[in-house]
């Protein structure tokens, strides 16, 4: 299915097509496993809200990931959709008093995602990149560095997000949302 999708991309999306192949593969400079790459891709697909990408990546993920991981990816995409809006506001608003106010938003899934917390952080970083929350990006990237991930691995997550976001744009242009 992935090859069929790539074959149907328009000529103007050739760079994205080639980049997709590259970012969905394991890299010697990144310690991300195939399962982590697929999980990040699915979290990003959910964050783009693009039905075509969601269906495409879900089909790959369903074959590679267990049910608890699939549920955690949905949780990461959903909780980050909430947190990224809230914390982007806190980060961007000029009144610093908002930074001192308690969020008063339930987000227990972050502490207990039902999978390895490092994987949940990878998914959260990817979704935060799509949603443009600088404060969240910094927090997740720093957590991953402290957990032992290299900057190349973090960059790999962001490259996956960037390429899939570009492909979501192609879907919109081609009316395939």
UniProtKB/Swiss-Prot annotation:
Catalytic reactions of this protein: N(6)-[(R)-dihydrolipoyl]-L-lysyl-[lipoyl-carrier protein] + a hydroperoxide = N(6)-[(R)-lipoyl]-L-lysyl-[lipoyl-carrier protein] + an alcohol + H2O
Disulfide bridge map: 133-136
Pfam families associated with the record: CMD (PF02627)
Key words, A-Z: Antioxidant, Disulfide bond, Oxidoreductase, Peroxidase, Redox-active center
Gene Ontology BP, a term: cell redox homeostasis
Top-tier EC class: oxidoreductase
Gene3D superfamilies for the chain: AhpD-like
A single MF term (Gene Ontology): alkyl hydroperoxide reductase activity
InterPro entries: AhpD, AhpD-like, AhpD_core, CMD-like
Membership in a protein family: Belongs to the AhpD family.
Job of this protein: Antioxidant protein with alkyl hydroperoxidase activity. Required for the reduction of the AhpC active site cysteine residues and for the regeneration of the AhpC enzyme activity.
UniProt protein name: Alkyl hydroperoxide reductase AhpD
């Amino acid at each position: 299915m992935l090859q069929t999708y790539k074959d149907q991309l328009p000529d103007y999306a050739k760079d994205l097509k080639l980049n997709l192949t590259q970012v969905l593969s394991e890299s010697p400079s990144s310690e991300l496993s195939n399962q982590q790459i697929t999980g990040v891709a699915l979290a990003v697909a959910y964050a783009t809200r693009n039905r075509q990408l969601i269906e495409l990546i879900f089909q790959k993920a369903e074959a590679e990931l267990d049910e608890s991981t699939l549920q955690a990816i949905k949780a990461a995409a959903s909780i980050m959709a909430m947190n990224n809006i809230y914390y982007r506001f806190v980060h961007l608003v000029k009144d610093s008093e908002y930074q001192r106010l308690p969020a008063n938003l339930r987000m227990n899934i972050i502490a207990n995602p039902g999978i390895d917390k490092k994987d949940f952080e990878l998914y959260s970083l990817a979704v935060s990149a799509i949603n443009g929350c600088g404060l969240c990006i910094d927090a997740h990237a720093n957590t991953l560095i402290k957990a032992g991930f290299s900057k190349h691995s973090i960059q790999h997550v962001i490259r996956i997000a960037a390429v899939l976001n570009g492909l979501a744009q192609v879907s919109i242009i081609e009316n395939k949302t």
